[in-house]
Amino acid sequence: LRPGGADLREMAMRPQAIPDEAIVLRVDQSAGIDLPAIYDITMEFSGASARGYQALSLIEDADQKEDTLYRTVSAVLGDHQLAESSVAFDVSSGIATIAARGLIGSPWDDGDARLELDVPFQSADSFSFEVDRSRPEIADIPVTVRGPVYYRRNIEWLLPEDGGEFRLLGATGINEVIGGTRLVSSTSLDPAKLQIAEEVQSLEWEVPASALPDIRRETLRMKRSLPRLRASREAKRRWEYAGAERSRLGPIADVYDMLVADAESDETGAYLYRFEFRYNTGDFAGALEDASAAIARDASADNYLRRASAAWQLDDLEQALADYEAAADIDPDYTLHTTRLETLALLGRTEEAVALVDENAFLFEDPKNEAMSRSYVLGFAGQADEGLDGLRDELAIEPDDAGLLNSLCWDSGIFDRVTEETLDVCTRAVEQANNSAGAIDSRALALYRLGRYEEALRDLDVVLAREPGQHASRYLRAAVKRALGREAEAREDLSVARHAAPGAAKLYEAWGLLEN
């Protein structure tokens, strides 16, 4: 004590020695990077936040406990499917531990035809310093640093051993102080495992407002240097799991089965997630079962469409048509679903398909869309010239419309009405559609009809390099390769296409592009 007291003194922040939050996350994509990932996460909390989980550990209401744990894990992973979870509190250490296991969708991006991963779930990626000091009256007020906090996170990402070489981009190490916060990260990549160890620790109570511009620049620079991965072109895609390779899907399928088994009697979510997984990996019979289970719980138009698409792939056209009709009865916007029209045509009911378009023309908000739909069904009905004339009439009004140009090119190709003038239309469609894969595919068909097989093949190679999941182009490329005498390569394309999208084969047979 001092006579007369003492002035205020600045109290320096003492960095915490024990993490408030320590997370160990394991993401298993050893089966393939284009598949859902199995996650295992352990989260340890200390201090005040741990006390809340102490109370949660004592709650007997399993649903309430699971909901809370789902939200806790979501704060790290975002959307996920929780299969198993637990919470425990150690009184002696004061540490709460949450453990969870489940599935996340594949976070790899294939937007430019190269699979890349901006590695998610990094603590540093969520660091920000967005503070408004634009108003003059508060411009000089110091900015409070979030804290005191101390986070530790370890991420282990398992990769396929036979998925080709993975390239690590970005910084392999970060060790800097930004805005009064210490950010440390180290990254390593083995052939089939990515490991990241992070720490985020506050060191100061506040920073001067004048430092904000530098802090924002440093934050942006740091985030742009965070590690990311690039896969090679040999990486297996989800539609390539056929034959013996399907055994690799087993661990993921087991988690989906667990989610379905634990679902409430009126819940559809678990069935729909499994439907998507099965459909995308070529298990259309399993997908149909899941869609049927979803319909039994929620007879929505979307669920009927799901089952219709599975039935279509299984060549059950009557079932597919019934489900498309059921979806349209619930939601009239689905009345003119393209695959419904195709199904009618393949069943030999082309007059019904034409009548359906004519009788429901009021559903088209734009006349050009009606012209495109009519041209398609008229072609199936043996009236292709009439349909193409309708497209030309619309093009006279909108000569640069990419959709109309592509429809004229495509319909001329599938119904064998291609001329040299058609090819000019196809090239304009490619130009107006900014070289879209769909327009290039249409031009390839026109080139094929003209016997210009090498040019058609070049176009199709471009399409499938950009959009490897556009399986209809594989059917067409198989036809082109056969015309060039490259039978083995044609069979390879057909094998992939028939596994991934067997339903499309019926159309290519109807158009004379594929043998029965």
Identify the residue ranges that each predicted region occupies.
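A sensor for short, sequence-defined functional sites
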Residues: 1-263, 267-269, 276-279, 309
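Structural marker of alpha-solenoid helical repeat scaffolds
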Residues: 262-263, 296-297, 329-330, 362-363, ...
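Start-of-helix register in tetratricopeptide repeats
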Residues: 269, 302, 335-336, 369, ...
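Canonical tetratricopeptide repeat
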Residues: 273, 306, 339-340, 373, ...
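Residue-level recognition of tetratricopeptide repeat
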Residues: 276, 309, 342, 376, ...
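Register position in tetratricopeptide repeats
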Residues: 280, 313-314, 346-347, 380, ...
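Terminal, low-structured helical/coil segments at or just beyond the last alpha-helical repeat
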Residues: 487-516
